[in-house]
Amino acid sequence: MAKHIVAALQIGSCPGSTKDTLKKILSYEKEIKESGAKLVVIPEATLGGYPKGSNFGVYLGYRLQEGREEYAKYLAEAIEIGNGEKYPEISQLCALSKATDASLCVGCIERDGTTLYCTMVYIDPKDGYVGKHRKLMPTAGERLIWGQGDGSTLPVVDTAAGKIGGAICWENMMPLLRYAMYKKGVEIWCAPTVDARPI
């Protein structure tokens, strides 16, 4: 197997602004190009934001109005995922991938109707958006705001760096998920996570 450079773009979200966060990601174009990276992994929930410490106005037995307002803002910052002009954030990530000749694995908050998912998207320099993985089991309080993935989004993607796939945060501790990916031939494991503990 040939050697390739794989990079982690260790950045955080711009609170409350997916637009500003996307600009921040795109601002690394020159550095990604100069690094020669063939794969760049961007942390869990970077686009859309990880609402660490928020409770969205929920206390056992209570739902407060200010929490509903906070959730509505969070929902508005989430992105829709797919190919084409209808998906401007994905289109801009595809342009970055093409310009840098690097595949991207990007953590984002996906909006599908009124359900949010913690998702990682795979972008290829030649083919653009090639797949996504929705977090199967949001951890603890995350279940208040994110839906569960159904297992249909466990791709292993062929890239110039090798076959990539992975899991988000605590999913990396799920042996059957890992086994499923190994059976699909994953060579490079992507683990975008907000969690600072070892995986």
From Swiss-Prot:
InterPro entries: C-N_Hydrolase, C-N_Hydrolase_sf, Nitrilase/CN_hydratase_CS, Nitrilases_CHs. One of its GO terms (molecular function) is nitrilase activity. It comes from the Eukaryota. It holds the Pfam family CN_hydrolase. SUPFAM superfamilies: Carbon-nitrogen hydrolase (SSF56317). The active site is at E44 (proton acceptor), K135 (proton donor), C169 (nucleophile). Residues 2-199 form the CN hydrolase domain. Belongs to the carbon-nitrogen hydrolase superfamily. Nitrilase family. This is Putative nitrilase-like protein NIT1.
